Structure formats: structure tokens, C-alpha cells
């Protein structure tokens, strides 16, 4: 239900038409299917049945996987996105450490520059000021701020880490089917990256 979030406090990382074109295909964008957008933001999501009207719309949505992916990447605090309410999304991320970072890395992969600093990477992948990505970056480089030649190689290493985590996760029972399909489609963009078993 991202159509109502344009211009909100959420930090949408990639606003290109190619990336956001799926929104026009969303079931929630059709007033005949979803006349009242407020159903996607029930006052008490933990109350039994509160999210069922929204989930029924998501169940027939052709882009539910895209919606859920972006909600996980952006860590949407409220609402039903891609068929999952916010408590369900939080639980999903808590069960798989590193999943939010890996999904975000894949989401912004085509924006990662060749020349990159530790701070650039943290800003690009996680958001300015966040320390969540630093352990990943520190695999090869201590935090310094000096520009590193071969940032492309660093990008590939980061992508391999993200792909390994996400591929394993989508093959398990924990990944919602619409998101698994969407992630598999996205992974096809990276055939040159070797994913270890």
C-alpha cells in the first residue's frame, strides 16, 4: 500500500520510474478493488481480524512481493504491505539476522558507485549515520574514510554476501511466497555473482 506514502517520512532509496513502476499495478491502486485505503492502516494491527480486509486485497495483488520487499527495506513502521502487518514483518526480520541489510544491498545494487568510502556505503545502503553495515564493510576494510580504489570489487563482495543470505532464506519455509518469487526474479539480475552453497 505504498501509493499513499509518497512524500512521507519514509526514505525511498530509488525513485526511478523503472523501480517504482509496479505501484500502478498494485491492487490497492484500483479504487474498485480497494475503495478505502484506510483499511491498510488499522488502528490496532494486533487485534484479531483487524488486518483481514487489507490482507484480502494483498492476496489478489500481482505485485505483493514488490510491496513487501520495499516495506522490509524501508522498515515501514505501520500498515499492511504485501500481505504482512507490521508485527509480522518485524518478526520476520528478527528471525533472520542481516535480512534487512541484505535486501537493501540488493535493492540499491545498481546505484553503488565504483569509488566508495565507508561513509558512502553506510549512507547508500542503510541510511546516514547507521552503524548496521559497518561489520559487513569491515570484513575487508577498517573504517577510515579514505577512498579505496577497487570499490567495484567491494561492491561484488558485498553483493555475494547479500545474495548468499537471501538465496538461503528464500529456499526455506520462512519466506512468504510472493516475496520469494520477487526475490528470485531480482536475483536473475546478478548471474555473474558466484553464490556459494
Task: Tell where the protein language model's regions lie, with residue ranges.
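Polybasic, low-complexity binding patches
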Residues: 45, 49-52, 69-103
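Major-groove recognition helix of helix-turn-helix-like DNA-binding domains
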Residues: 129-143
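Short, amphipathic alpha-helical "recognition" segments used to contact nucleic acids or chromatin
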Residues: 98-115
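Short Lys/Arg-enriched helix C-cap and helix-to-coil transition segments
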Residues: 144-166, 174-175, 183, 196-197
Amino acid at each position: 500500500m505504498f501509493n499513499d506514502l509518497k512524500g512521507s517520512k519514509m526514505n525511498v532509496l530509488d525513485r526511478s520510474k523503472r523501480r517504482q513502476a509496479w505501484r500502478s499495478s498494485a491492487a490497492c491502486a484500483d479504487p474498485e478493488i480497494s475503495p478505502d485505503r484506510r483499511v491498510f492502516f488499522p488502528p490496532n494491527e494486533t487485534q484479531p481480524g483487524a488486518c483481514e480486509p487489507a490482507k484480502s486485497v494483498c492476496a489478489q495483488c500481482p505485485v505483493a512481493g514488490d510491496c513487501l520487499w520495499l516495506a522490509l527495506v524501508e522498515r515501514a513502521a505501520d500498515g499492511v504491505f504485501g500481505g504482512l502487518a507490521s508485527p509480522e514483518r518485524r518478526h520476520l526480520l528478527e528471525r533472520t539476522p542481516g535480512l534487512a541489510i541484505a535486501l537493501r544491498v540488493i535493492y540499491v545494487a545498481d546505484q553503488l558507485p565504483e569509488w566508495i568510502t565507508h561513509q558512502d556505503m553506510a549512507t547508500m545502503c542503510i541510511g546516514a549515520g547507521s552503524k548496521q553495515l559497518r561489520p559487513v564493510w569491515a570484513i575487508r576494510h577498517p573504517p577510515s574514510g579514505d577512498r579505496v580504489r577497487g570499490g567495484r570489487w567491494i561492491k561484488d563482495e558485498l553483493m555475494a554476501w547479500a545474495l548468499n543470505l537471501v538465496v538461503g532464506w528464500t529456499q526455506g519455509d520462512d519466506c512468504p511466497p510472493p516475496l520469494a518469487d520477487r526475490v528470485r526474479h531480482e536475483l536473475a539480475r546478478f548471474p555473474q555473482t558466484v553464490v556459494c552453497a
